[in-house]
Swiss-Prot record:
Keywords: Calcium, Disulfide bond, Glycoprotein, Heme, Hydrogen peroxide, Iron, Metal-binding, Oxidoreductase, Peroxidase, Pyrrolidone carboxylic acid, Secreted, Signal
Signal sequence, start to end: 1-23
Enzyme Commission numbers on file: 1.11.1.7
Glycan attachment points: N148, N169, N203, N274, N309
Disulfide partners: C34-C109, C67-C72, C115-C310, C194-C219
Gene Ontology biological process terms in this record: hydrogen peroxide catabolic process; response to oxidative stress
Enzyme class: oxidoreductase
Name of the protein described by the UniProt record: Peroxidase 2
Function in brief: Removal of H(2)O(2), oxidation of toxic reductants, biosynthesis and degradation of lignin, suberization, auxin catabolism, response to environmental stresses such as wounding, pathogen attack and oxidative stress. These functions might be dependent on each isozyme/isoform in each plant tissue.
Cofactors that this protein relies on: Ca(2+); heme b
Amino acids binding heme b: H187
Entries under InterPro entries matching the protein: Haem_peroxidase, Haem_peroxidase_sf, Peroxidase_pln, Peroxidases_AS, Peroxidases_heam-ligand_BS, Secretory_peroxidase
Length: 314
């Protein structure tokens, strides 16, 4: 007969296995409950990105900023809270597109598809709409009832981050160095505000001089002057999802400090070189990293809720 301690251990193992099973996401989650969910999301995203290519980057960023703060739970969509954090305030975009998608999905499947899953699918569809690779999005996330502004301030990478800080930041989310470099490649699309690259323009030496001169015209040195002026993160092909971001780094044309540190004599130099010359390798690493990121601490089963309106709890 088993001892009490061994029975307790067996129960703990069983509970852990059940917990792991419940946390598993599935590519077929909505096949029965809402079979047209993915096609509805894709149509809305494609239309939004075709209308404004920058929106693709904004939707990818929403998913990233969601997953890095208490997991992929759509907490970033709740009004206030995380939206007021330093890395998000005045720069997060795409809420109107998400709201439009949610309205369309609710019309065909009431309270079935989570806002967290909408973000994950919209990120994939945005990349595809801009010519990038596709991947299978695992589904079944549920929406949080809380958000965490303080965690958004501490856990989201800053544009001034050092390489060591970036590696540590991603590692704490279960993402390795290759994941970090690959996910940074999302900066092949989108734009950044002058206030986030001004210091690099005027105070750093590992920047192409012609590149810096061109940017200074729209980003004056005085703080407070032109802070919100925009520049593309990838000046070569700003609206195409490709590997030009890495090629730019090889020429010291990274816009943000946190971009150029990936190629500055450090441990990630070879990965940048590889992704620059081998688009297939970048695409493979990027899609794998997006799946891993999308699996950060999801709410599943009966956890959380399926919000009716992405900006507020039910």
């Amino acid at each position: 007969m088993a001892s009490a301690s061994s029975v307790s251990l067996m129960l703990l193992v069983a509970a852990a296995m059940a917990s792991a099973a419940s946390a598993q996401l599935s590519a077929t989650f909505y096949d029965t409950s809402c079979p047209n969910a993915l096609s509805t999301i894709k149509s809305a995203v494609t239309a939004a990105v075709n209308s404004e290519p920058r929106m693709g980057a904004s939707l990818v960023r929403l998913h990233f900023h969601d997953c890095f703060v208490q997991g992929c739970d759509a907490s970033v969509l709740l009004s206030g809270q995380e939206q007021n954090a330093g890395p998000n305030a005045g720069s997060l975009r795409g809420f109107n597109v998400v709201d439009n998608i949610k309205t369309q999905v609710e019309a065909i499947c009431s309270q079935t598809v989570s806002c967290a899953d909408i973000l994950a699918v919209a990120a994939r569809d945005s990349v595809v709409a801009l010519g990038g690779p596709s991947w299978t999005v695992l589904l079944g996330r549920r929406d949080s009832t809380t958000a965490n502004e303080s965690q958004a301030n501490t856990d989201l990478p800053a544009p001034s981050s050092s390489l060591a800080e970036l590696i540590g930041n991603f590692s704490r989310k279960g993402l390795d160095v290759t994941d970090m470099v690959a996910l940074s490649g999302a900066h092949t699309i989108g734009q950044a505000q002058c206030q986030n690259f001004r210091d690099r323009l005027y105070n750093e030496t590992n920047i192409d001089s012609s590149f810096a001169t061109a940017l200074k015209a729209n980003c004056p040195r005085p703080t407070g002057s032109g802070d919100s002026n925009l520049a593309p993160l990838d000046t070569t092909t700003p609206n195409a999802f490709d590997s030009a971001y890495y090629t730019n780094l090889l020429s010291n044309k990274g816009l943000l400090h946190s971009d150029q540190v990936l190629f500055n004599g450090g441990s990630t130099d070879n990965t940048v070189r590889n992704f620059s010359s081998n688009t297939a390798a970048f695409n493979s690493a990027f899609t794998a990293a997006m799946v891993k990121m999308g699996n950060i601490s999801p709410l599943t089963g009966t956890q959380g809720q399926i919000r009716l309106n992405c900006s507020k709890v039910n």
